[in-house]
């Protein structure tokens, strides 16, 4: 099975972690304070070690109040070089704006009203070029 590193073990990512563990995955996750057996986001040594052994990486951390993505700002260089075969960003459908009910996917233009979230989406897409 795989080993996923989840940045930001909140509501949605927490449900994913539970399902993956039930399927035999190893799950390492970060929180701001390191609660419940997670890594503290600011624990650079621990996070870098997790980046080196994760087969999959997911961030569910939104941009901060300054509009910066804290994961990319703190660990972007290491993420770009991580050996994981898959890297994902759990964003928001709000980045697509009002589509009038039309289906959207990652190739749809970003028209949302939250420029920071749109910028984070684009930064994650460009991170590894794959």
Q: Which sequence ranges carry the predicted segments?
A:
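Active-site Tyr-X1-5-Lys
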Residues: 110-130
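Conserved N-terminal Rossmann-fold NAD(P)-binding element of oxidoreductases
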Residues: 4-8
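NAD(P)-cofactor binding segment of oxidoreductase domains
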Residues: 52-89, 117-123
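N-terminal Rossmann-fold NAD(P) dinucleotide-binding loop
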Residues: 13-14
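Conserved Rossmann-fold NAD(P)-dependent oxidoreductase catalytic core, especially the SDR/UDP-sugar
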Residues: 76-112
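Short beta-strand "acidic-cap" motif of Rossmann-like dinucleotide-binding folds
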Residues: 27-29
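Adenosine-cofactor binding site in Rossmann-like domains, unifying the SAM/SAH pocket
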Residues: 31-46
């Amino acid at each position: 099975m795989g080993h996923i590193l989840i940045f930001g073990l909140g509501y949605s990512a927490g449900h994913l972690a539970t399902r993956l563990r039930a399927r035999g995955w190893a799950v390492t996750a970060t929180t701001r304070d390191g609660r419940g057996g997670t890594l503290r986001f600011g624990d650079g040594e621990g996070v870098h070690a997790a980046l080196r052994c994760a087969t999959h990486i997911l961030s569910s951390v939104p941009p901060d109040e300054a509009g910066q993505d804290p994961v990319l700002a703190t660990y972007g260089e290491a993420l770009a070089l991580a050996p994981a075969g898959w890297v994902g960003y759990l964003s928001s459908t709000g980045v697509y704006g009002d589509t009038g009910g039309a289906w959207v996917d990652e190739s749809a233009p970003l028209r949302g009203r939250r420029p920071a979230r749109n910028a984070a989406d684009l930064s994650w897409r460009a991170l590894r070029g794959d």
